[in-house]
Amino acid sequence: IDAIGLQCHLAPGNLDMEAFLQLVEQIRQRGLPIYITELDVNDQIFADDIAERDQQVAGVYSDFLQEMLQQPGIEIIQTWQLSDKYSFYQGRQERQVRVLPFDREMQAKPAYHAVAQALAIQGND
């Protein structure tokens, strides 16, 4: 085993961050690099208003990444696609999903800026 990938399809309200961080620590103690993979945020419980929902999704990305980037051993962060157009959640909800950093036309959304800011902050530490 060269590394451990943790699929992170985040569902707000369903993530026990303390337990997740304990898992990350257990993996780190074994000397394995940790890859955050398939990162997206299920927006199903968020507001119908797109601007409000985008901010809510961005907040989840920001909170999660700020916590994760403080952990030693995190080497890769990878989203589950870049654009909502290709999201796993497309067709699983009645409304258009807004779960990834870019919209259907590849325009950056608040989630993109939240990810970029979290990475920039970590890069300055």
Language-model region placement:
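Short, conserved beta-strand edge motifs with alternating hydrophobic and charged residues
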Residues: D2-Q7, Y35-E38
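Surface-exposed cleft-lining segments at the edges of enzyme active sites
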Residues: L6-N14
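Residue-level recognition of the N-termini of beta-strands and the immediately preceding loop/turn
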Residues: I1-D2, E75
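Aromatic-rich peripheral "rim/lid" segments of glycoside hydrolase catalytic domains that contact
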Residues: L15-D125
